[in-house]
């Protein structure tokens, strides 16, 4: 009798879990800002970098690129080479404005525009469409030697392999030199 009750309960639990609908998300990626963390060395000096954290969902799970994804539309000179697009925004008169960040190039004796854009690896090993969700941490430089005491933000969006673009998220205000800010 006890065995029949146990088997009946196991069957009931199995049926309950097998009837669950799979998670569904839109095919366009969606991201949500989770936070920013400054990276500080053991001696309490600022590294000049931080971690931007955000969560993501994608209905068909086609997020990320392989190293071999070098042909159009993912070629180096193509508009979709990067699957994480990041805009640098500087606080000017109390408002955050998209600003190109420049870096001196000693070879050309001119300034180059710095890009914060990135390529992140595929998040699934298969091309079979399946909804995914998770969290991503991205290490990013925040210190600007040409303007060492700025307040900035980043705007971030991602693209999937089908070139669907996510919503845009924005970080909170970030100090390019948080150690100096604490001393003021």
Range-by-range predicted roles:
Residues 15-18:
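C-terminal motif of bacterial Sec signal peptides marking the signal peptidase cleavage site
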Residues 1-5, 10:
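Positively charged n-region of N-terminal signal peptides that target proteins for export
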Residues 20-23:
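Bacterial signal peptide processing site
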Residues 30-184:
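First exposed extracellular module after export/assembly in secreted or surface-exposed proteins
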């Amino acid at each position: 009798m006890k065995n029949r009750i146990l088997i009946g309960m196991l069957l009931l639990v199995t049926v309950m879990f097998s009837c669950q609908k799979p998670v569904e998300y839109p095919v366009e990626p969606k991201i949500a800002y989770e936070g920013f963390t400054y990276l500080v060395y053991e001696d309490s000096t600022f590294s000049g970098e931080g971690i931007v954290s955000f969560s993501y969902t994608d209905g068909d799970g086609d997020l990320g690129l392989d190293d071999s994804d070098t042909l159009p539309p993912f070629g180096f000179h193509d508009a979709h080479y990067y699957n994480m697009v990041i805009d640098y925004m500087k606080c000017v008169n109390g408002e955050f404005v998209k600003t190109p960040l420049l870096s001196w190039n000693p070879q050309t004796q001119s300034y180059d525009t710095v890009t914060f854009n990135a390529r992140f690896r595929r998040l699934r090993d298969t091309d079979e469409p399946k909804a995914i969700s998770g969290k991503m941490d991205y290490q990013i430089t925040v210190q600007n030697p040409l303007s060492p005491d700025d307040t900035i933000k980043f705007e971030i969006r991602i693209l999937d392999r089908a070139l669907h673009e996510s919503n845009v998220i924005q970080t909170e205000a970030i100090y390019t030199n948080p150690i100096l800010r604490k001393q003021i």
